[in-house]
Amino acid sequence: MANEGRIATLDSTVADRLPVYSKLLFDGKAAKGLSFETIAKHLDRSEVACAALFYGQATASPEDIDRLSDLLEISKETLTTQMTGFPNRGQASPMPPVEPLIYRLYEIVQNYGYAYKAILNEKFGDGIMSAICFSTTVDKEVDEAGAPWVVITLKGKWLPFSRF
């Protein structure tokens, strides 16, 4: 099923776990009929980073606030007051997740987490992949039969454990 013209809006079941400004941003997004792709281009950020701002999972720069205010026609003062604190990451969803798509991502880690860990350890040594010095993209591919496929790329700096 094509998704032409449809955009993500604020799910009322998670709204109470998000910052107050999330509703303002999503209302502005919906009123203008903008996709995260369009907003991300305006912010000069990735789609995932842009969406993370809306969910209160990323820090907004002064430039982000200026551009969001301009694009979504939301008071710069309001956004500055509400978006300049520190994000409270990881609070938007219950654990384990109950939303089906988010649960599938959780399930991927459950099923393949140790396999990822083993391969990463063999390639890089004892350490972890940073989720701070990190980027991610979401892309769409279509196979020969016309079926859509999701491509999620995770890129994180390798952080070796230090000896002490």
Curated annotation (Swiss-Prot):
It comes from the Eukaryota. Its EC number is 4.2.1.104. GO terms for molecular function: cyanate hydratase activity; DNA binding. The keyword Lyase applies. Keywords: Lyase. The keyword Repeat does not apply. InterPro entries: Cyanase, Cyanate_lyase_C, Cyanate_lyase_C_sf, Lambda_DNA-bd_dom_sf. One of its GO terms (biological process) is cyanate metabolic process. The active site is at R104, E107, S130. It catalyses: cyanate + hydrogencarbonate + 3 H(+) = NH4(+) + 2 CO2. It holds the Pfam family Cyanate_lyase. It is an enzyme of class 4 (lyase). Gene3D superfamilies: Cyanate lyase, C-terminal domain, lambda repressor-like DNA-binding domains. Catalyzes the reaction of cyanate with bicarbonate to produce ammonia and carbon dioxide. Belongs to the cyanase family. HAMAP family: Cyanate_hydrat (MF_00535). NCBIfam families: cynS. This is Cyanate hydratase. It comes from Fusarium vanettenii (strain ATCC MYA-4622 / CBS 123669 / FGSC 9596 / NRRL 45880 / 77-13-4) (Fusarium solani subsp. pisi).
